[in-house]
Amino acid sequence: SVLTFNVGSSSLKIAYYQQQQCLFNLTVDIKQQRANWTGQIPTSLVNWQSMGVLSDDACYVAQALYQQYQVLPLVAHRVVHGGHYHQPVMINIETLAKLQQLAPLCPLHQPPTLAVIEALAARFPQLIQIAAFDTSFHSQQPALSYCYPLPLTLRNKDIRAYGFHGLSCQSIMRQLLVLDNTINTGKLLIAHLGNGASITAVLDGISQANSMGFSTLDGLPMGT
C-alpha cells in the first residue's frame, strides 16, 4: 500500500492506494482548517477536523491508517525542488539535508513538505518514505533553456533554470497518451493553472522549457 502527500501553497492533499487502486482522497484546506474527502476513508477520519498544523495532520492520517489496517504503508511525497535528483529517491539523513539546502528557492512548499517528512519519521521510525520531484521532468531540457547568461564561475554553483510543476506535466502526459498514443511525437504546450501557475513546452515527450526558472518565483503571476 502507498500513502501519498502533496503539500501545496494552500492545501494538503493525501491519497491512499492499495494494489494501484485509490481507496480515498483527502484534501485539507490550510486556511479554513477543513478536510474534504472521497472514497473509503478510515472510520476515525470521518468526523475529523484539521488541526491547522500540516505535520500534525499528516501524522494523524498515518496513525488512522495504521489503526485501520495494522500495516504501515510506503509513503511518497511530492517535493517541489529536487536539485540534481532526476529520479525519485528514498529519504534518509543525507537526502533530507540536501533537500533542506534547496528550501530558500521554494519557500512556500519545501519547508512544510520537509516538516511533514520529519514528523512522520519521528512518529514512525520504520516508515519508508520516498520523494518524487517537480524538477525531474525538466532534467532533460537543452542547455539553451536551462543556462543563464552568467560567468562560468556562477553557473558552476548550480545557478540555472530548473523548471517546476513537472509531476503535473507527467500526469497530463499520461492521461493524454490514453486519448492519443501519438502525443509523444510532436509539440505540446502544458498549462498548469492553479494557485501556482506555469507553462511547459514539450517536444516528443521531453520538456524543452518551463516558465519557471532558478526558483518557483519566476514566470506567470500566481496566487501569492
Each language-model region and where it sits:
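Generic structural signal for well-ordered alpha-helical scaffold segments
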Residues: 62-66, 117, 121, 173, ...
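Electropositive phosphate-/nucleotide-binding environments in soluble metabolic enzymes
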Residues: 52-59, 89, 93, 107-114, ...
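Gly/Ser/Thr-rich active-site cleft segment
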Residues: 77, 107-172
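Short beta-strand-loop/turn "lid" adjacent to the catalytic site in phosphate-handling enzymes
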Residues: 62-110, 128-130, 136-147
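Glycine-rich phosphate-binding loop of actin/hexokinase-like ATP-binding domains
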Residues: 140-224
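Gly/Thr-rich phosphate-binding beta-strand-loop-beta motif of the actin/hexokinase/Hsp70
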Residues: 1-36, 187-208
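Contiguous, glycine/small-aliphatic-enriched amphipathic segments in soluble metabolic enzymes
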Residues: 15-78
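Short, basic, glycine/proline-bearing loop/turn elements
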Residues: 43-45, 49, 98-106, 157-158
